[in-house]
Structure formats: structure tokens, C-alpha cells
Amino acid sequence: MGQKINPLGFRLGTTQSHHSLWFSQPKNYSEGLQEDKKIRDCIKNYVQKNMRTSSGIEGIARIEIQKRIDLIQVIIFMGFPKLLIESRPRGIEELQMTLQKEFNCVNRKLNIAVTRIAKPYGNPNILAEFIAGQLKNRVSFRKAMKKAIELTEQADTKGIQIQIAGRIDGKEIARVEWIREGRVPLQTIRAKIDYCSYTVRTIYGILGIKIWIFLDEE
């Protein structure tokens, strides 16, 4: 049987780049890694609390962290930054203060920037959040998948594959359902493929959502 490799790790250095850019001594590496995880969790929790959207989409595509000796630069790529800025005009400053308190940055400055991504529904994380919201509202999974595919078609993507696994529609036996539209060449390294794996808690249990989006070929 074919071995499934993570499409992002498989393409690192060709079409994908790292989301954390910093160097450290081997003995301090694990601390740096934990710090990154905490920063990302803290930002996601803050956005979840302060962003009131009807669809329940946080809209965070990815969070990039660049570290220097005296500075931590955090860039948040969002699909709908307007919603965060409108609900909290001083939201970014508040978030910066919260993070500085949390990490006790005495000798390091922390800087947060928010960047809008051009086509939000061409991003698998935002799409997975959309599907998760639909499944929580007990929309049938096929309907949710089809709606997600319609949204990506508007974002000019070349192909998409969506997979949902678990107790779908509350059935007794867990199963895997998937749908593909267009081309998704997972074996081609020069193909720019974005991928995300997302878990959603429904009343019947946990469902896993995986999304592969074929953006372009280099």
C-alpha cells in the first residue's frame, strides 16, 4: 500500500518554506519549539475569543515566527483581518501586550503584523474551519464538501481533495469519505500543494478533516 507522506514536509525547500525562522543551540532547541507552540496557541485563543463571526471561521491561514536575539517578529496571515480589527480596534496592541506578559520578554521586543491573504478560500486551513462549522451545525457532510469545493473554484485553484473520517452523520461505524475535483498530483514535487489536517468535535465524537489544494505548477 502507498505510504502517505505529509505534502508540506515533502516539498520543503522547493515550493514550501518553513513557518519558523530561527537558529539556536541544540540544548535550547526544545525550549524554542515550545515557545513557538505557545505563541501560536495564544494567538489562536485570542482570535477565537475576540472575533465574533456568524460562520465561526477564525480565518488564520498560518502564523510565521522569525526570531533574532533582540526581537521576535510574528506575522499572522489571515483571510478576514477586517473582522478582527473592526471588532477590536486596538486588538493587535492588546494581543502584543498579552504575549509580552505571557513570555516575560524583558530583553526581547515582540512585534506582531497582520497580513491579509488574497484568496481566503484557496487556503486549506480556512476551508477546514468552514467545513467544521457546517458539520457542527449538523449540515450533511456531502453538502458541506460540495459547498467548500464551490468556494475554492472561485479562488482559482487547479484541484482540491477533501477527506472526512470518523462517525459521519452520527453513524455507529466510523468510515472515511472523500471527494476530489480537478487535479491533485501528490507525487509531483514541483506541484505547489497546500495541505491541512483539522479535527472537529461534534456531538457524536471527533471527526478528522484533511484538505489538499493544488494551487499551481512551477
Swiss-Prot record:
Single GO biological process annotation from the record: translation
MF terms in GO: rRNA binding; structural constituent of ribosome
Record's subcellular location: Plastid, Chloroplast
Residue intervals of the KH type-2 domain: 47-118
Alphabetical UniProt keywords: Chloroplast, Plastid, Ribonucleoprotein, Ribosomal protein, RNA-binding, rRNA-binding
Cellular component per GO, a single term: chloroplast
UniProt cross-references to Gene3D superfamilies, sorted A to Z: 3.30.300.20, Ribosomal protein S3, C-terminal domain
InterPro entries the UniProt entry points to: KH_dom-like_a/b, KH_dom_type_2, KH_sf_prok-type, Ribosomal_S3_C_sf, Ribosomal_uS3_bac-typ, Ribosomal_uS3_C, Ribosomal_uS3_CS
Subunit organization: Part of the 30S ribosomal subunit.
Similarity annotation: Belongs to the universal ribosomal protein uS3 family.
Entries under HAMAP family matching the protein: Ribosomal_uS3_B
The protein, known as: Small ribosomal subunit protein uS3c
